[in-house]
Design a protein with these regions (language model features):
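N-terminal Rossmann-like NAD(P) cofactor-binding subdomain of oxidoreductases
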Residues: 1-188, 193-195, 285-287, 322-324
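Alpha-helical scaffold segments in soluble metabolic enzymes
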Residues: 11, 15, 148, 152, ...
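C-terminal substrate-binding/catalytic lobe of Rossmann-fold NAD(P)-dependent dehydrogenases
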Residues: 196-263
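A generic structural signal for well-ordered coil/turn residues at beta-strand boundaries
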Residues: 132, 228-230, 275-277
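A general secondary-structure junction signal
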Residues: 166-168, 221, 265
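Short beta-strand or tight-loop elements
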Residues: 118, 215, 277-279
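C-terminal active-site/capping subdomain that shapes the small-molecule cofactor and substrate pocket
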Residues: 235-325
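Conserved active-site and cofactor/substrate-binding residues in soluble primary-metabolism enzymes
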Residues: 7, 117, 141-148, 195-203, ...
Length: 325
């Protein structure tokens, strides 16, 4: 587990530690080496010391989860792949397929020779490819919720235009010193941010287009006064009139056999998905005919760490739900 001292890395380490079929061989940190993980995160109860990642001491390692910041992950991912190690990357370094789009939003890529080689890790959409993958790009939290909310419509080529208002807790900022997420700034408060453009928008557009609906997306994220949880509200204009009953039937059929995506009879809430790998979806049609689709997830679970383990299970030929129920 590379980068185990951040929120998503620490949680991934805890899930692997408790996993019935995996052994956590090492947990590394660039900033907290020498400290114990169970001292940094007592509630995860992972009694292991954090060390510096030594790429020359990886004998017997089958897989790695990398939880470094965007831009910093790619060189480490490349080094691990050179050694034949399966990699689940939690950063954005391998999510986008177009190099110009990546450069616009993230800058120069740290491993251009690997760009475009990762399988996008939205498990419910790419399950077959993930079973054969050697490098998985775990989706961003906002794209996870938003694309799952819209996928049944996108797969039918129904989306014409999409507006998304998404809200999440402060853990989405990571272990940030930004005073925006200090308790005194966030308590009894909520606000939009990056209103003129967020880097998850092109990721959402990429995946909707790949499913069959190259629709323009307007995306505005909001910050909520809670630590974990994310709610995505998606307003979709369809290319042709479709009844509410037909749309709900489409969602029920698409997700009926999914172990972690549940289609609800009413709007979802964040408390129900906290500390789970679940995504709760609800879809309806408002009076003017526009579809409104909702998805609730825990942003550091299904939006990052547990989805990474869900994909790792598939890569290793394990039960997809192992360690996650």
């Amino acid at each position: 587990m590379a980068g185990a001292s951040g929120y998503t890395g620490a949680l991934a380490a805890q899930i692997v530690w408790d996993h019935p079929d995996l052994e956590l061989a090492a947990a590394t940190s660039r900033s907290d080496a020498g400290k114990r993980l169970d001292r940094l995160y007592p509630r995860y109860r992972v009694p292991i010391g954090l060390s510096v990642l030594d790429l020359d001491r990886l004998d017997g390692i089958d897989a790695a989860i990398v939880a470094y910041p965007h831009g910093a992950a790619a060189p480490t991912v490349a080094a691990l792949r050179e050694r034949g190690i399966l990699v689940v990357d939690l950063s954005a370094d391998f999510r986008l397929r177009d190099p110009d789009t990546y450069a616009r939003w993230y800058g120069e890529h740290g491993a251009p020779e690997l760009f475009g080689t990762g399988v996008y890790g939205l498990t419910e959409l790419y399950r077959d490819q993930l079973r054969e993958a050697t490098l998985v790009a775990t989706p961003g939290c906002y794209p996870t919720a938003s694309v799952l909310a819209l996928a049944p419509l996108a797969e039918q080529g129904l989306l014409s235009e999409v507006f998304i208002a998404a809200m999440q807790g402060t853990s989405g900022y990571g272990r940030s010193s930004d005073d925006t997420v200090h308790f005194s700034a966030m308590t009894e408060n909520a606000f939009p941010y990056k209103t003129e453009g967020h880097r998850h928008r092109p990721e959402i557009e990429q995946e909707l287009a790949a499913l069959g609906s190259p629709a323009p997306v307007t995306f505005v994220p909001h910050l909520l006064p809670l630590d974990q949880g994310e709610l995505s509200t998606c307003f979709a204009t369809l290319g042709e009139p479709t009844s509410k009953e037909a749309i709900r039937s489409l969602y029920a059929k698409r997700y009926g056999d999914e172990p972690f995506v549940h289609v609800l009879d009413g709007p979802p809430n964040l408390r129900a998905v906290r500390d789970t790998n679940e995504c709760h979806v609800y879809v309806t049609v408002e009076e003017r005919g526009r579809v409104v689709a909702f998805a609730a997830i825990d942003n550091i679970w299904k939006g990052a760490s547990s989805q990474g383990v869900q994909n790792l299970n598939l890569m290793l030929g394990l039960d997809e739900t192992a360690g996650l129920l």
